[in-house]
Amino acid sequence: MNAFAIRCFALVMAAPLGAQEKEPDPRAVQPERPTVATHAHTVAPGYFEVETGVQGDRADPGQRTYSAPTVMKIGLTSHTQLNLNTPVFAAGSGQSSGIGDVSVGLKWRLLDDHAVLGDFALLPAIKFPTGSVAKGTGSGTLDLGVTAIASYDIRGVSMDLNAAYTRVGGQNSSSASSATLWTASFGAPVMGRLSWVAEFFGQPTIDGSDTPSTAAFLTGPTYLVSTALNLDFGIIAPFHGDMPNAIYAGVVWNLGSIARRHEQAVRSRTR
């Protein structure tokens, strides 16, 4: 969500090096968390970044269930990025510990600085039923989805708008259904390395099922420890439909160039 602010920070740090070296640091993090929305930007080609954290949902009065949403990202080209989502659940009310449904996606930025769409990208993804329905860690369905992403900078405030559609595979003999998601996410610098994010998001029912629509508000600070490391924490408060309130905390860390790490590993083995 604060990718724009971080790119600006990287440019400021690079300014004394001269005009020819004002390109953003390839290790500058591109945080997609903590918001539900993602942005249109991508990790630098050949670089590896991981996002992880803990989220506690208030399942019952006095009880919370905890999960660790984790996303691994690899920059493929200047405009494409491979995502691997591997959620992990801790034992709690209505769920056992274990790995949830794994998903793979490819973010492809199609436009830069468009007059209407801003930085525009598409993110097709597939979710596999690797979790357990019985243990409460998975849906038991194979899902296909695509997210349209429009990112803007409005006088230093970053705005990310997402619209997603998912075709939910039928479980056993049941028919497939459809799911949608909308998000409007905002981020702005507060002071120094401290920024703040705020987001509205919702899941309207479109398939005629009895599943109620939901909507919620997310907000909290983020702190850029270094160009390659960003921290976040905050709250999620529902205002429509049946969904739990939640607290979260997490980290985004760019681990650097995959090729460079491979070369270092080879050198260490040959010594």
What are these regions (language model features)?
Residues Q20-R271:
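Transmembrane beta-barrel domains of Gram-negative outer membranes and organellar outer membranes
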Residues R7-P16:
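Bacterial N-terminal signal peptides
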Residues M1-F4:
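N-terminal secretory signal peptides that target proteins for export/translocation
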